[in-house]
């Protein structure tokens, strides 16, 4: 019995010592330091794909800081050219005008909100139980409701509803794109991006030149005249008219055509990418340990730079900038 106990203690010690040793990315050569371009008024506290909140309540959009303050304990959901979309601690949807005026709009829903967006008089909401709804901004009346499968577990990177003229694209928590006509209030089509059991919500969507690209954590879809799907373990994705670039959990940068045809791949052992952007003729991959990897679009050449960044910094991708902590760097 004593021997068994000793063996168990030894095995446990070995297990924990093995788990505590984490491999990290170490570049073979660093070209130099990528200097900070400027500072924010406070550190980043919340991030979404479209905007971020600072510790002092100020809003950070892709264009930079705005003279808008969001109340403490509110959760940032989304931001567009007209509205800053938030959730209050009581579960209400609260819209703040993007121009900084005081004419806020409150929807007393008393429900947990996963994602939301606003266009003209249409407010599109995805609730955390995967229910989709359309409301009138002016009257606050419910115009449309559609239920879906309640997810077991989701990725924190939840994509907001997307407006395409009169169409509303709900990006569900179970890996589907549900297309609703906002005028007729009818579901026109449902497209499956991925069918994994866990963490299957859509994390990204963009439409360029009538080609739709959407992804979950495990799959990417391209939809134009035809549908194409490919499986990747996706950390970050960037999409332009020239192609798609993916940073994977395996430390790879992968280049695809807009229709998902494979073009190139470059692997960086143990790299944990936290941001990806395509600017001009370069692909910029931000690595968690404080490195900027600048690659040519064909991934045949690259340079690595040091960045003054901590591994636990919250990251926000702006227009030609990476924001982290209370500062930013330019990549244009």
Where are these regions (language model features)?
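Acidic, serine/threonine- and glycine-rich low-complexity intrinsically disordered segments
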Residues: 140, 145-146, 152-258
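Sec-dependent bacterial lipoprotein signal peptides
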Residues: 1-21
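Hydrophobic/aromatic beta-strand positions that recur at structurally equivalent sites within the blades
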Residues: 60-63, 95-98, 135-137, 180, ...
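Loop/turn residues immediately N-terminal
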Residues: 55-60, 89-94, 129-133, 174-177, ...
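Hydrophilic extracytoplasmic domains
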Residues: 241-332
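A short beta-strand motif characteristic of beta-propeller blades
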Residues: 32-34, 63-73, 101-108, 141-153, ...
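Bacterial Sec signal peptide processing site at the extreme N-terminus
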Residues: 15-36
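Repeated scaffold domains used in trafficking and secretory/extracellular systems
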Residues: 35-48, 69-83, 108-121, 152-162, ...
């Amino acid at each position: 019995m004593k021997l068994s106990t000793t063996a168990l203690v030894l095995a446990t010690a070995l297990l924990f010592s093995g788990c505590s040793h984490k491999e990290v990315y170490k570049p073979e050569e660093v070209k130099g330091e990528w200097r900070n371009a400027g500072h924010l008024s406070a550190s980043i506290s919340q991030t979404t794909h479209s905007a971020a909140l600072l510790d002092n309540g100020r809003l950070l959009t892709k264009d930079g800081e705005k003279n808008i303050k969001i109340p403490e304990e509110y959760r940032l959901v989304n931001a567009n050219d007209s509205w800053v979309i938030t959730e209050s601690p009581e579960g209400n949807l609260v819209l703040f005008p993007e121009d900084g005026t005081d004419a806020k709009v409150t929807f007393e829903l008393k429900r947990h909100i996963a994602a939301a967006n606003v266009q003209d008089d249409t407010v599109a909401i995805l609730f955390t139980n995967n229910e989709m709804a359309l409301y009138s901004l002016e009257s606050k009346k419910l115009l449309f409701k559609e239920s879906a499968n309640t997810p077991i577990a989701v990725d924190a990177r939840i994509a907001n509803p997307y407006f395409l003229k009169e169409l509303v694209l709900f990006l569900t928590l179970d890996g589907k794109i549900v297309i609703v006509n906002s005028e007729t209030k009818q579901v026109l089509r449902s497209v499956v991006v991925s069918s994994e059991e866990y963490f299957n919500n859509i994390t990204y969507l963009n439409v360029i030149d009538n080609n739709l690209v959407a992804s979950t954590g495990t799959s990417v879809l391209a939809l134009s005249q035809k549908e194409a799907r490919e499986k990747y373990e996706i950390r970050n994705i960037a999409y332009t008219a020239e192609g798609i670039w993916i940073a994977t959990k395996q430390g790879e940068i992968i280049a695809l055509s807009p229709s998902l045809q494979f073009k190139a791949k470059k692997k960086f052992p143990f790299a944990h990418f936290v941001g990806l952007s395509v600017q001009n003729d370069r692909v910029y991959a931000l690595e968690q340990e404080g490195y900027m990897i600048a690659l040519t679009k064909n991934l045949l050449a690259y340079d690595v730079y040091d960045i003054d960044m901590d591994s636990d910094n919250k990251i926000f991708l702006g227009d030609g900038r990476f924001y982290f902590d209370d500062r930013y760097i330019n990549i244009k």
